[in-house]
Structures are given as structure tokens and as C-alpha cells.
Regions:
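Polar, enzyme-active/binding microenvironments
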Residues: 2-305
């Protein structure tokens, strides 16, 4: 391997896909969360048979399972994808009711290892915590009797998200129209949450904000609003995971691809190379590609392009 090739790899921080010989081309790799350049995969899945008002959604990291929370059934539905990351191959497996805690469930978030999930809704203004004895299997789920009240900041919470290590919680709702930030003194335990006195307003982007999601590094945040539902809004954070440093930097308009009148939930998978959102008006999950390609190196000249 040549010295210039190694320097290229270090500079871009990504290992090459392949090497084609001394006179060939090295392709460095791909980058996810390229939301502004997102393209519809022409793939979707209708949840109508189980849930006619889908809101929060989550995807297992390996792309083989989908989870949908909605207020039609007040439960979390589990689906298997026979082809990883291909939403059109989903089939229903089981469900777990959250109706004892929530009558209007909205937001859903799964811990990255699949042993816990969290739900928020407008009926109680609380974030509820659940555990699964078998990871990613909602038939083994149970309520942990752990919750966190957010009504001092938001009385109509719709969306929630966590920092990847479980030490930060974020809640977005329709009343304050802001993303609120909390610290968990014990990671992934919502009963230990406290408000950071930090928030970020999205009111200028819509009056009915419903969803908040972060990229894996906390340097970008994505929101949706029910009254401007065709848009996925992009926000850049100059300090990772600190929403007080956020600013609106772009959008993805999905109106040319789907009739997005009521986006209810949003989630990324495959290192941010796939994006999915739920559509309440027609009970459907849509799939997008959100990937960009890095530079390639001409091995004969050392030129990148």
C-alpha cells in the first residue's frame, strides 16, 4: 500500500471499499445522514392492519426489525424485515400494550442494545421506561415503574430522543414548540433525569412539532412538524448534544415523492444511510436513502476526485 494511499485514508477517516491495482481507482467509502440529499427508495409499508395512527418508530441497528408506536392501538408493534433495511419486506410479529401508562402515545425510542424502550405521550406529559428480558422482543417487555414528568417544560410532548450513551434526554412538543434537554445522572434511567435549563425553539418552522432525532455524533438534529409535514428540518449543533448551540441549516422536501401530510415519527438506520418516517394520514412507513459518497483516489496520479 502506497504512502499516498495511507495518507488519503487517514485524512478522510474511512477505510477504502476496495483497491483496483496501481493504475486503478480507490473509492474511500460512504457517509450517512446526508438528509438534504435524501432520495425516496420507492419502498413503503402500511401498518393499517395493526395500527391506524402510527407515530413513533424505531429500527434495530442491523435492519431486521421495525417497531411502531401509535394511538390507534396504544401499543408498540414489532415487525420483522426479511431483507435488512428494506421496509417493504416487513411483516407483523407481536405487540406490547402501553395503555396502562399512555392513552395518547406519541414518541418512541429504543436503547441501542434493544434491552429498553421509552415512550412519551400527550395524555400524561411523562416519559415512561420499559425493559425487555430478550433484546428486541416486545413480547418480553414490561413497565419498569420508572418515569419522568416533563410538564414544567412541555404539556403536549410528542417526540423524544437520547444521547447515544444514555446520559441526555431530549423532548419536543406542540405547546412550547421547543426541544428541551435533560441530564440523566444514571444512564438510561429516566427517573434520574433533571432539566438542564437548555432548550431550542423550532416555532419558526411549524406550529405543530412532533419529532426530534439526532445523528450518531450529536452534531446534527432533525425535526418535523405536522403542519409542514413534507419537510424534514436539519439543525447543526456547534457543540455536540447541546441544543442551545443548534441552528437551522437545511431541509428535505418530501412532497415530490410522497403525500406527507402528517409525519408522525422519524428514524435512521445503517449508520444513517437509511431514513424512515411514519405517515399518520395513510398509516404508512416510507423509506429514503440518505447517503453521500466520499472522494476517490486515482492510484496512478494521486489525484482525488
Amino acid at each position: 500500500e502506497s504512502e499516498s494511499m495511507e495518507a488519503f485514508r487517514i485524512k478522510n477517516g474511512i477505510s477504502a471499499k476496495r483497491y483496483l491495482g496501481s493504475n486503478g481507482t480507490e473509492t474511500a467509502g460512504t457517509v450517512g445522514y446526508a438528509v438534504s440529499n435524501g432520495t425516496y427508495d420507492s419502498k413503503s409499508f402500511a401498518t393499517t392492519a395493526q395500527e391506524n395512527a402510527p407515530h413513533g418508530i424505531s429500527i434495530k441497528p442491523d435492519g431486521t426489525k421495525l417497531f411502531v408506536l401509535g394511538n390507534g392501538g396504544d401499543d408498540v408493534g414489532e415487525y420483522t424485515l426479511s431483507t435488512a433495511y428494506d421496509i417493504s419486506t416487513a411483516s407483523f410479529v407481536d405487540s406490547f400494550s402501553v395503555s396502562t401508562q399512555l392513552s395518547l402515545p406519541r414518541g418512541l425510542f429504543f436503547k441501542p442494545d434493544g434491552t429498553k424502550f421509552y415512550a412519551v405521550g400527550t395524555s400524561t406529559d411523562k416519559v415512561f421506561q420499559y425493559s425487555m428480558t430478550t433484546a428486541w422482543d416486545v413480547s418480553t417487555a414490561s413497565y419498569e415503574s420508572k418515569e419522568f414528568l416533563v410538564s414544567s417544560q412541555e404539556t403536549s410532548p410528542f417526540g423524544l430522543s437520547f444521547k447515544t450513551d444514555g446520559t441526555k434526554l431530549y423532548v419536543l412538543g406542540m405547546t412550547a414548540k421547543s426541544v428541551f434537554q435533560y441530564t440523566l445522572s444514571t444512564a438510561w434511567d429516566v427517573s434520574t433525569a433533571s432539566y438542564d435549563s437548555v432548550s431550542y425553539s423550532v416555532s419558526s418552522l411549524g406550529t405543530l412539532p412532533v419529532c426530534v432525532v439526532f445523528n450518531s455524533t450529536g452534531t446534527e438534529m432533525y425535526t418535523t412538524s405536522a403542519d409542514n409535514a413534507q419537510f424534514v428540518r436539519i439543525h447543526t449543533l456547534t457543540t455536540a448534544w447541546d441544543v442551545s448551540t443548534a441552528s437551522h441549516t437545511g431541509s428535505l422536501d418530501t412532497s415530490g415523492d410522497v403525500t406527507a401530510s402528517q409525519i408522525g415519527g422519524l428514524v435512521f438506520a445503517n449508520s444513517g444511510q437509511k431514513m424512515y418516517f411514519s405517515q399518520q394520514s395513510n398509516d404508512t412507513i416510507y423509506q429514503y436513502s440518505t447517503v453521500s459518497y466520499t472522494q476517490a483516489l486515482d492510484l496512478s496520479t494521486g489525484t482525488t476526485f
